[in-house]
Amino acid sequence: MVKVGIVGGTGYTGVELLRLLAKHPQACVTAVTSRKDAGIRVDEMFPSLRGRIDLAFTTPDEARLAECDVVFFATPNGIAMQDAAALLDAGVRVIDLAADFRIKDVFEWEKWYGMQHASPHLVADAVYGLPEVNREAIRSARLVANPGCYPTAVQLGFLPLIEAGVIDTASLIADCKSGVSGAGRKGEIGALLAEAGDSFKAYGVAGHRHLPEIRQGLARASGKPVGLTFVPHLTPMIRGIHATLYARLTKDVDLQRLFESRYADESFVDVLPAGSHPETRSVRGANLCRIAVHRPQGGDTVVVLSVIDNLVKGAAGQAVQNLNLMFGLPENEGLDVVPLLP
């Protein structure tokens, strides 16, 4: 049984980790931390976990995290980089759901995240936790940088095309929409129902923090830098990301066969039949990316539609998928969840 600690268990990704791990047959949550809510029972804050998680939140100092086999950081950016080194020195493996270890260029990370990196020496050792790309490296990793939500949907959509060398990588476009839970569980004017409901807007057009992460992953697949325009949007839904991706074909190729072949052995990527249009509700609550590929009017533009639940395949579910790989467990352990409908 893998002993699990969660740092920052009161946010949406934290409670999603608790939901998934509560039914995991080979993992046991032994500590959940929150400085602000220390002493409060988990099932008091989250009644959905009554009868599933018999723990109270504790401070990180009281949590005895060094006795865990693995610790998840479901914290804001900048926390894991301060605390991960001590846990790693104690032999604990770490999965960071924030962005502290995702970008290999530390100076680039500091520019986008507006703070000095506290553990730059760990960045090179961190494995980027996208299993569909780095499965073997994740198995032996001590420190995993769990991908962001937009980067997961965008990379899984573009990768078959880039790996096959059939598109112009100088002018990629990612037009993405997210539900409000992507902003986290905090009080902000823009996330209020009266502000976000019945409305739809783009944001971060001049530059979003996920842009360098996406470019890094696509450049690695391409073997050279890529040109990417990434525009995120906020939609009046709670969960879900819909990425509409555009690229120019440079070779004639059977796109459906290309995508089906690339993901044939991937349990958590579902390539839909030709002509399909995936819906965000079809992946709600599940660790699943659904993809459809189109070539409108048989032209030289390829359009890829990629949908995920931002809290599951875009965060906590992918983190549990990484845990399974790190501890030699079946990759779908605890993740065989049917999406919620309606």
Curated annotation (Swiss-Prot):
<comment type="similarity">
    <text>Belongs to the NAGSA dehydrogenase family. Type 1 subfamily.</text>
</comment>
<dbReference type="Pfam" id="PF22698">
    <property type="entry name" value="Semialdhyde_dhC_1"/>
</dbReference>
<feature type="active site">
    <location>
        <position position="149"/>
    </location>
</feature>
<dbReference type="InterPro" id="IPR050085">
    <property type="entry name" value="NAGSA_dehydrogenase"/>
</dbReference>
<dbReference type="GO" id="GO:0051287">
    <property type="term" value="F:NAD binding"/>
</dbReference>
<dbReference type="GO" id="GO:0006526">
    <property type="term" value="P:L-arginine biosynthetic process"/>
</dbReference>
<keyword id="KW-0055">Arginine biosynthesis</keyword>
<dbReference type="Pfam" id="PF01118">
    <property type="entry name" value="Semialdhyde_dh"/>
</dbReference>
<keyword id="KW-0963">Cytoplasm</keyword>
<dbReference type="GO" id="GO:0003942">
    <property type="term" value="F:N-acetyl-gamma-glutamyl-phosphate reductase activity"/>
</dbReference>
<comment type="function">
    <text>Catalyzes the NADPH-dependent reduction of N-acetyl-5-glutamyl phosphate to yield N-acetyl-L-glutamate 5-semialdehyde.</text>
</comment>
<dbReference type="GO" id="GO:0070401">
    <property type="term" value="F:NADP+ binding"/>
</dbReference>
<dbReference type="GO" id="GO:0005737">
    <property type="term" value="C:cytoplasm"/>
</dbReference>
<keyword id="KW-0521">NADP</keyword>
<dbReference type="InterPro" id="IPR000534">
    <property type="entry name" value="Semialdehyde_DH_NAD-bd"/>
</dbReference>
<protein>
    <recommendedName>
        <fullName>N-acetyl-gamma-glutamyl-phosphate reductase</fullName>
        <ecNumber>1.2.1.38</ecNumber>
    </recommendedName>
</protein>
<dbReference type="InterPro" id="IPR000706">
    <property type="entry name" value="AGPR_type-1"/>
</dbReference>
<comment type="pathway">
    <text>Amino-acid biosynthesis; L-arginine biosynthesis; N(2)-acetyl-L-ornithine from L-glutamate: step 3/4.</text>
</comment>
<keyword id="KW-0028">Amino-acid biosynthesis</keyword>
<keyword id="KW-0560">Oxidoreductase</keyword>
<dbReference type="InterPro" id="IPR036291">
    <property type="entry name" value="NAD(P)-bd_dom_sf"/>
</dbReference>
<dbReference type="InterPro" id="IPR023013">
    <property type="entry name" value="AGPR_AS"/>
</dbReference>
